[in-house]
Amino acid sequence: VNTKDQDEKKAIATFLWMFSSVMIMIERLPASMLSNFAAHVFNSECGIYMDHYEHPTVEQTLRLQVAFYMMSSMTEFAFRDIKNVGSNDEQEKGTQRAFSNMSLMKGLNLSGTLVVEGFSLIYNCMAYICEQKHDIKDMMFYNKQHEYATCEAWRLNPDDFETARRYAAAVDETGRRFYTVVGNFKEAVLCFEKANEMFVELFKQEKHSTILNDMLLSSYNIINILNAEHLYDLLCMKAEETLALVTDRMDDPDTDLGLVAAICESKGHALMMLKQFDEAWVWLNKAQKVYEDNLNKNPEDEKCMRDLAIIKCRIADYLMAKGSDADNIIAIVNEAEGLLKKALDIVPDSPKVAKNYIGLLSTKMKVYLLKRDINAADETLAQFEKLTLKHILNTRDTSLIQLMFAVYDSFIDTAVQSDWTQMANALLQVKQNAEKQLVENRLMKG
């Protein structure tokens, strides 16, 4: 609304505040609508503030800061709705708008706790966009800005529980990116352990479901590292320690049972690797039951589909380790593949589904190697190379290189295990050829 009357401007801004407060309370309202409206509120308050830029009142300054935080928060809220779908014009447009508003706030030298927390939310969105684009350098830049902003907000308000929780969550997110994107285990472990320690201390102060779920996630991240390092005894100890904290919270509707199931799944896999098959079966089935229930409640949720597909692959690995019938194992893997294909229909460009599919093909290939089914093995290997080597060469995304070679090694080991020497040698040549192509294209050192 174009008006120069100050009372009218304030009345319009106040109306926008009241209307936005009502909108936020409406369930199922599109997050993008809330984000756009919050941007209008911020622009309105910004206009009033700029009219009195040389001598703004305390009220005008506070209203602008709160409006900026609401705009940042609603941008991040809308961002969650469209996460994990690859590069997306809608998410970029909203985040770039918020980024411009952040530059404006910095120019005004307004740096209270709310403003700094708003900065942190926008930086996190920017980091995620760069992650989706495989822009590792900018991803880590914005990620560090996100972490620094949450730390600064905590410094400004050290007694606030939520501010401390957000800083711990930012450290945990830094660990995730070091681990899953950069492949730096050493830095990831430092971040995960620091975040987990903070979450445990916060949980002792206030046993709220939010902090419980944060603690579950940070514990799961540590468990993932222990699994990658093959430290299965330590993994089981960490899982038991974590699950003991949620024993009396399983019926709490706010407890993230998906995280509980993920920890059960990891423990089951570790027990399988320790050859404790009976106990492993119990934990794997516990996890599968939770994932099945989640998918029944949310039949169109791609994450629920991925979770169930992953546990089915785990169970297939378990049955392989026990020497079960190969046809039964393939049937389970095919069920998992059906779930991942449906997830890809929902989010075609999802990097997470693609990585899960690589894991599934790894399991499938091993079954065919044990069966000595050369035609099926060749077909599966071609699918695997399409998702890994060809993808890396086409996009120059190097984040999958480490995973690809680890899977190649597992194929070779499985062929040797089944006394299929000719196939083991052929797979070794395939791996060496992949290395050669990556070196020639300057995607890895020779």
Predicted features along the sequence, with ranges:
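"A position-specific structural signal for the A-helix of alpha-solenoid helical repeats
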Residues: 17-21, 44, 69, 73-76, ...
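Fold-core signature of tandem repeat domains
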Residues: 167-168, 191, 195-198, 215-218, ...
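Flexible helix-coil transition and linker loops at the boundaries of alpha-helical arrays
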Residues: 2-11, 28-34, 49-67, 84-88, ...
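TPR/TPR-like (Sel1-like) alpha-helical repeat modules
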Residues: 382-389, 425-439
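Residue at a conserved register position within TPR or TPR-like alpha-solenoid repeats
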Residues: 78-81, 123, 130, 171, ...
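Residue-level detector of the short coil/turn that links helix A to helix B
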Residues: 134, 182-183, 230, 275, ...
